[in-house]
Amino acid sequence: MSEPRQILVTSALPYANGSIHLGHMLEYIQTDMWVRFQKLRGNQCIYVCADDAHGSAIMLRAEKEGITPEQLIANVQAEHSSDFADFLVDFDNFHSTHSDENRELSSLIYSRLREAGHIATRSVTQYFDPEKGMFLADRFIKGTCPKCAAEDQYGDNCEKCGATYAPTELKNPKSAISGATPVLRDSQHFFFKLPDFQAMLQQWTRSGTLQDAVANKLAEWLDSGLQEWDISRDAPYFGFEIPGEPGKYFYVWLDAPIGYMASFKNLCARRPELDFDAFWHEGSKAELYHFIGKDIVNFHALFWPAMLEGAGFRKPTAVNVHGYLTVNGAKMSKSRGTFIKARTYLDHLQPEYLRYYYAAKLGRGVDDLDLNLEDFVQKVNSDLVGKVVNIASRCAGFIHKGNEGVMVGGDAAPELTEAFLAAAPSIAEAYEARDFGRAMREIMALADRANAWIADKAPWSLAKQEGKQDEVQAICAQGINLFRQLVIFLKPVLPVLAADAEAFLNVAPLTWNDHLTRLENHQLNPFKALMSRIEPAKVEAMVAASKEDLLAAEAKAPAGNGELAKDPLSAEIEFDTFAAVDLRVALIVKAEAVAGADKLLQLTLDIGDERRNVFSGIKSAYPDPSKLEGRLTMMVANLKPRKMRFGVSEGMVMAAGPGGEEIYLLSPDSGAKPGQRIK
């Protein structure tokens, strides 16, 4: 038998500036399931996390609420801890980046990087708020977009036209904090020389530490050449002051990942059997895994391993990246009630419903996961109540009535027992690979076989026949043993169901290897309902409560002046209505003005195997139509041809904007090809 593995696991640190929602929970639930699986297998697996508790946003929110930043992060940490615990996320330690351990480790790593020559200093020019007496991050500056002239845009990118730019390019800049006009000032900043680690990162990112899609994306960064990373911020700032540099603070993204180390070090102080160095020092034999979302890959797969390498610590064994959560096929929406906080969910539904649904849909890739609320109800009710729990509820009564709760009768279905045993390695392999969806499919296939076998044997019919009691007992004992196997396989996902099943089965906490054994001549406890069906009305109430959360927030906020306020969303449509529209990528082969028409351009579009003639009212925005030639755009390809005075228009190109000169032709991402369907 192999030695137990030593494994340290982390999830990304939630920011201590707001509530946990179901999108966040996607990460913590999948990490918790993987950790529980490792522990079930007998491995030493430690799961640590912490609140990310530094930064200007926290400082400013605390000021707005009239409390100290320390009070704010303590309040948020209590809320986060409660939400995680009630969702059955079982951290070995949930700490804070605002801790003594994190201060010491951040200073240590910085000093080692500086001594090794990996820190540079130079003056940078930034906007400064003269009223607040502070330098402004890009997101705290608003003004007019230098590209499209849209107002009220952030200091780094325009939400209207998508342009990116330096804050100094923004027209009519204003501080989003005070409303004052910012002034430019110079300040000395500290930079981490990330290019020093280019060769190491090129090798490390291709060494199996990342999913292929993630490694390919990072290759784009690496191929274009890495830039030095600004790791300092000026006072006032809530965080750790850089040693020996009064008024200079570590940027939140420097000390945040060090929070993984700090949380583990804090745990080591309370658990003497744990050795910090054994897990973190260079050459460590322990395994280290980070679970993160795809939005923070660059920090965890470029900056973080480079910092560790430069400071003489070990690098992660792997960084496991996941996609975003959508609800009912769309981005979470406060107006539709699908931006659901963890606590709002818990006020209406059991946590294991969502744990199972996430498990059933999670693969090992970085694709987004959709929480379809109708499918959620159907799948949980069908799989967990209708299949798994149904086996126990079908069989338990006969054993209690016919034999006072004692299981007897031997193995009544050797071929089924063997099938369950044979499936265990594949299920374990799927769990290990984080392919939870595959594991759930294989487990439910076994549940289907067990239910079909019981239905075929029909103990309820045999119980009415004289002389069939022994057969009834053997069938039902077999059913309970199969149920026990399923509980073992599902235990990482459904810990409460497993604990309740263990109480019914009258057994000690089950381990993975218990699937190799059977219960014979064993006394059961009285059966109690293990899980109830989801009531659709409760899901509807949860959505309604989420809308109420929005109304409460809107009551406190000033009226918006964004694009939705100017042009509200249209009424909802059914998916089939949308699916009837055939959207395609199109190459603009030719573009020319239409004689006698003030607004029209005539476009010749290549959509792969054919060309289309399209008239479009975009002339005011594109006075030189020849500049459109060679550009990819998007078109409605199945629009009925329309006869116009100038000819027949065979489709419609897609554009955004209010009209006139403010029309912006839409373009697909690089790599798209003419004729490809837009999905």
UniProtKB/Swiss-Prot annotation:
Annotated InterPro entries: aa-tRNA-synth_I_CS, Anticodon_Met, Met-tRNA-synth_bsu_C, Met-tRNA_ligase_1, Met-tRNA_synth, Methionyl/Leucyl_tRNA_Synth, MetRS_core, MetRS_Zn
Q: Which cofactor does it need?
A: Zn(2+)
Its recorded reaction(s) are: tRNA(Met) + L-methionine + ATP = L-methionyl-tRNA(Met) + AMP + diphosphate
Residues at which Zn(2+) binds: 145, 148, 158, 161
Which parts of the sequence belong to the tRNA-binding domain? 577-679
Placement of sequence motif 'HIGH' region: 14-24
Top-level class of the enzyme under EC nomenclature: ligase
Q: Where is this motif: 'KMSKS' region?
A: 331-335
Single Gene Ontology BP annotation? methionyl-tRNA aminoacylation
Family indicated by similarity:
Belongs to the class-I aminoacyl-tRNA synthetase family. MetG type 1 subfamily.
User: What name has this protein been given in UniProt?
Assistant: Methionine--tRNA ligase
Q: What is the originating organism of this protein? A: Pseudomonas putida (strain ATCC 47054 / DSM 6125 / CFBP 8728 / NCIMB 11950 / KT2440)
